[in-house]
Amino acid sequence: MKGNDNMLEKNNLIFIYGKAGNYKSSIGVSLLNSTDKKACYINLDNNNHFKINDNIKVFNEVSDIDFIKKCISDYSIILIDYIELLEINNDELLELKELVKNENKTLIIISCCSNNKELINNSHYVELKEIADLMILTDR
């Protein structure tokens, strides 16, 4: 899909954000499957029900941010599903953003809004929005 490639090329840091069960992972995997670039899927949420294209490398275990940095150097598009499982702070997110920007890569991060919060009227959303090049919100 040419439109998705264009969106992925123009945005270094993309957040897919929403409450649990709002198809965030489906959107991220669809973006990955639509590109022919070297890509990887960091599947921290143990999603086994998705059909991932054979050319996409899947990692199910990640120990720390250094592994993500290595993925950024090795792949053009990196999908992390979902970031809260790594307990990465905002300074580390900014560091990752700078790295993908400098290397002209795309990092797609799935982030979950707590079910007891409003989708966009919370501090977590505001923090992510300030550093994202693109926010994709899901709400049903």
Question: Each predicted region: which residue ranges?
Answer:
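Conserved catalytic network of the ASCE P-loop NTPase/AAA+ motor domain
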Residues: 8-9, 34-35, 70-73, 98-104, ...
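Conserved nucleotide-binding/hydrolysis micro-motifs of P-loop NTPases
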Residues: 45-48, 84-86, 113-118
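Structural motif
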Residues: 15, 77-81, 108
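N-terminal pre-Walker A segment at the start of P-loop NTPase domains
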Residues: 1-7
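Conserved P-loop
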Residues: 8-70
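Substrate-engagement module of ASCE P-loop NTPases
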Residues: 90-117, 129
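Conserved P-loop NTPase "ATPase switch" module shared by AAA+ and STAND
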Residues: 71-89
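Phosphate-binding/switch region of NTP-binding enzymes
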Residues: 112-140
